[in-house]
Every structure is written in C-alpha cells, then in structure tokens.
C-alpha cells in the first residue's frame, strides 16, 4: 500500500528534479517551461497525498485549479516562444535579453 511518506517522497523527488532542470539549463526556454510544469506537478502530488490522508476533497479541488492555471501558462508560454522564434530565429534565453520598442 502506498503511504503518505511515499507520496511526499515522490513529490519531493519531482520537485528536486525540476529545480535542477531550472538551475542547470538556463538557456533553453522549452526546458525551462517543462521544469516549471514538473514543479507544478510535484505540488499537485503533495496536494493529492494530503487530501487522501485527511479525507478532505479540498486538496483535489486545488489540483484541478492548478492544472487549469498550468495549462493556460503553458499555452501562453508556447505562444510567446513561437513569436520569439519567428522574430529572433532562436529560443536561447541568453540572446533574448534586449527589449525592442
């Protein structure tokens, strides 16, 4: 049987992997977006774990809200990424440090 400790451990491992992805790869926007999505997934795992342990459905409702916000964030991020690639021909974060008026 899966206990609360197992689920919290899984959430912590996912969070650490996403944090490492953000700090180790700061050049590729796609990897940064994927790392942020993985971080939100680890938070969702923790919400589900505590919701299951306490017998309360509020954690599951928060998960649906977070998934909705994450989907909107991913769509906006990818739209910005496509626009960035069309104008600059790169998705490297280091080359996109200047604003154009």
Curated annotation (Swiss-Prot):
UniProt membrane topology term: Multi-pass membrane protein
Parts of the chain that traverse the membrane: 4-24, 30-50, 62-82
Keyword Metal-binding: no
Broad enzyme group: translocase
InterPro entries hit by this protein: NADH_UbQ_OxRdtase_chain4L/K, NUOK/Mnh_C1-like
Catalytic activities: a quinone + NADH + 5 H(+)(in) = a quinol + NAD(+) + 4 H(+)(out)
Family annotation (Pfam families): Oxidored_q2
GO molecular-function terms, A-Z: NADH:ubiquinone reductase (non-electrogenic) activity; quinone binding
GO biological process: ATP synthesis coupled electron transport
Enzyme nomenclature, EC number: 7.1.1.-
Keywords: Cell inner membrane, Cell membrane, Membrane, NAD, Quinone, Translocase, Transmembrane, Transmembrane helix, Transport, Ubiquinone
Subcellular location: Cell inner membrane
Entry keyword annotation includes Phosphoprotein: no
GO cellular component: NADH dehydrogenase complex; plasma membrane
Function according to Swiss-Prot or TrEMBL: NDH-1 shuttles electrons from NADH, via FMN and iron-sulfur (Fe-S) centers, to quinones in the respiratory chain. The immediate electron acceptor for the enzyme in this species is believed to be ubiquinone. Couples the redox reaction to proton translocation (for every two electrons transferred, four hydrogen ions are translocated across the cytoplasmic membrane), and thus conserves the redox energy in a proton gradient.
Subunit structure: NDH-1 is composed of 14 different subunits. Subunits NuoA, H, J, K, L, M, N constitute the membrane sector of the complex.
Cited NCBIfam families: PRK05715.1-2, PRK05715.1-3, PRK05715.1-5
Family of this protein: Belongs to the complex I subunit 4L family.
Name of the protein this chain belongs to: NADH-quinone oxidoreductase subunit K
